[in-house]
Regions:
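Short, surface-exposed polybasic-aromatic patches that bind anionic ligands, especially phosphate groups
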Residues: 1-356
């Protein structure tokens, strides 16, 4: 009466209308059965008495699945390697003896990671444009040939020695886009009281950081001084600018992999061991982190199963994930998930197709 059985030779069968059909894998069998049943061993004598049907199943469905955890994973990352990883026999960075290469894109499930924090950033190149990556996300920098572009880069701490990470646009999109940088149409006065820096306009004053004051001075703002009492007598007035508030230490390839975290902010991940080269067409080159089995994923726009080898399979609904036994094991934004190669959709209609 078991919906899924395994022969003494290891062949899986799934019951369809009282007929046992050979099936490619447990994922296909569970989808057909509509429940997260475990395969029960069936003896040869019982198998010989059973009605047998044609082989069915989805050939590229995940071979093994992780049971649903109490709390979904929420710390996936999409990364770029900045340099070739040195080969080591004790701690290879991928299976099969192949090493992670410079500029490879790697998607990782729950890696050890650190946010860029308030003091670190990354400079990236993508499709002829430079971007600043911070712990909050990404913002485009003004063109390098413009006055604003030169002023912003100098104040941020960008120079000829700063490493620019070359990002494909799909990986760039995994970082949350921040409001664009902008200077006031008419530069305000930059006032130094000795205790702080202020932007003064006819409407009033707004506080500045030293980095912002340097940028405004670089585009022609007049610099002057005043006493704290003179500033205190002026009204607060919003200033139409959006400029970085501080300079940064910029990431180099020696610092680790530069990554987009689950929430879209910048992060750093140490070079990871055991990543696997991805098969099929995808932006990502490698994947790692699901050694316990494939997981059900909620992308916020739909459901998928990601296999231990990094293939993503579309799933119709949460009920299918429950039937697979994974439930929602991870919450991963589509911007990261889409970097992986797409496998066959996991649904009952596809699973019931007779294989040739």
């Amino acid at each position: 009466d078991a919906p899924i059985v395994r022969s003494e030779q290891g062949q899986l069968f799934v019951d369809v209308n009282d007929t046992y059909h050979p099936v490619f894998n447990l994922a296909s069998a569970r989808i057909i059965a509509g429940q997260a049943a475990e395969a029960q061993t069936i003896g040869d004598e019982h198998l010989q008495e059973a009605l047998l049907g044609s082989p069915v199943g989805i050939s590229d469905a995940p071979g093994y699945l992780a049971a649903a955890g109490e709390t979904p994973q929420q710390r996936w990352a999409a990364c770029l390697a900045g340099k070739d990883e040195a080969p080591t026999t004790e701690n290879p960075t991928s299976i099969g003896g192949h090493q992670v290469a410079s500029q490879e894109v790697i998607v990782l499930a729950e890696p050890e990671q650190k946010s860029l924090g308030e003091e670190r950033a990354a400079l990236v190149d993508s499709e002829g444009r430079q971007w600043l990556i911070t712990q909050e996300g990404r913002v485009a920098l003004p063109d390098t040939s413009s006055t604003e572009g030169r002023v912003v880069r100098r104040a941020l701490g960008v120079d000829d020695s700063t490493h620019a990470w070359p990002l494909p646009p799909e990986l760039l999109n995994a970082f949350a886009e921040l409001p664009p940088l902008n200077f006031p149409a008419d530069p305000p006065e930059v006032v130094d009281t000795g205790q702080g820096l202020w932007a003064r306009t006819p409407e009033g004053i707004a506080e500045l950081t030293p980095t912002q004051a340097e940028m405004l001075a670089g585009v022609g703002a007049k610099e002057t001084t005043a006493t704290p009492q003179e500033i205190a007598a002026l009204a607060d007035a919003p200033l139409n600018l959006n400029l970085p508030s501080t300079s940064f230490h910029f990431l180099s390839p020696d610092d680790g992999w530069m990554c987009a975290a689950n929430e879209g902010g910048g992060a750093v991940v140490p070079a990871q061991a055991g990543t696997v080269a991805l098969a099929g067409e995808s932006v990502a080159h490698r994947f790692g982190g699901l050694n316990a089995g494939g997981v059900g994923v909620d992308s916020g726009h739909g459901y998928h199963v990601v296999s231990p080898t990094g293939q993503r399979h579309e799933v119709k609904d949460k009920e299918t994930l429950e039937a697979l036994g994974t439930g929602v094991g991870a919450q991963v934004p589509w911007e990261i998930l889409r970097l992986l190669p797409e496998g066959s959709a996991l649904n009952r209609e596809q699973a019931l197709q007779v294989s040739s």
